[in-house]
């Protein structure tokens, strides 16, 4: 069974398509003082015109230490201000850990504090995104929306 079919069965999302062009995906590497502001990803793929639905992130730095920072933060949404409301969860970038989450219209995430790994160490991950047909409730956001926390 193809991986996309397994994801569809696991999540109930039908149809589901891999973003084979890796728009916004691929390798993500951050060294000393690197960070990623809390943001919502694009909701509509700018070329394929499909709705972004799932993020799959795999962490690839061996021996990454918690003291260096860089845990992925998942935030709730403030519907009055359309901004992040509260940090709900932190996920440490443990080597070979995979995170799969629904890229909803309000799924704020990032690691806003600067990281502090020693020279030669990076926070490495690989991101792959999955798309579906556009729903009637999808906001048309063709690029990520960032907020400073």
Feature roles, as predicted:
Residues 1-23:
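Signature of the catalytic double-stranded beta-helix
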Residues 28, 33-37, 41-53, 61-149:
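Catalytic core of Fe(II)/2-oxoglutarate
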